Amino acid sequence: MRLTRSLPAMVTALLAAFLATGVSAQTVLRFGHANSPGEVAHDLYKEFADNVTKKSGGQLTVRVFPSEQLGKEVDLLQQLKSGALDISSPSMPTLNSMVPAFEMPSAPFLWKDWKEAEAVIRGPAMEPIWTELKDKHNIVPLTKIWYWGWRNFTFGTKEVRKPEDMAGLKVRVPESPIWVEMVRGFGAAPTPIPFGEVYTALQQKTVDGQENPIPTIFSRKFYEVQGVLSMSRHMLQNNTILINKSSMEKLKPELQKLLIDEAAAASAKNSEMQQAREVSMLEDIRKSGKTRIIDNPDRDAFAAKMVPVYVRLESRWGTENWKRVRAEIDRMRSAK
């Protein structure tokens, strides 16, 4: 009888002893993204996850789910907000569905070079925008920087050296206001097509052209069905690694720091690798002989066409946000 009465107490004591072993201290974070195994991004995300597990002594495990296993990029972002997902790596334009001002770093012809862009994205001019993401959507950055590259135009046969050369051409764009307004500003017809259908659309001449970073143009073999590559460098593509704020706050400070440090290390390695790939893959495209490369299109003429585009999008981004970013760019340039 006494044994029966003491059984709950024994179970409680055993459970407490089990928890005291530290098993309960193990935390698993789920990291969903859109890239495929074998791509640089996925390989670095996996390396990031492995380093976190190793350096935390097994206290923290990051499980990586590639290839849109958990949903498309926009879906992953919503899961990140709700806490159904812990970590993801959206592009800045994807974030515009939550905070439209995140489109600004992708504004055409905004940046002189990557160094300038990186400093502003990390700096105080963008801080209120990151704060809005945190306060309204429960999301914070592990790294604000994940260099993807400068986007360039490709076309079937048309040699595009100046905006007037694009008049009337159908150009594939992501379904995002900044891309639509940009292509329209050049006098072409923006045509939203899902990324997975771009190669077929080019091959079947559903559209005349598209734009992407060099590593994408090469790895997706767009250059095989496009006869012209115009090195417009019109837009910077930067991604991020973000974490659900509640997931982050549940971790001990030393584990929070570990995540941030390892994300920064992966980001730095990615920047170095991707910039090297831009150079080597452009050379591979050149050597293929399948694509004529226009190395020096009239970038000033293209940039001039973007002034009214900025005016149209300023209210979407927030006038104060846009003024603050432009002022920081001007300050940096005048200091040189």
Regions found by a protein language model. Give the residues of each.
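N-terminal signal peptide c-region/cleavage motif recognized by signal peptidases
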Residues: 20-22
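Bacterial N-terminal signal peptides that target proteins for export
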Residues: 1-11
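N-terminal secretory/targeting leader peptides
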Residues: 26-117, 125-336
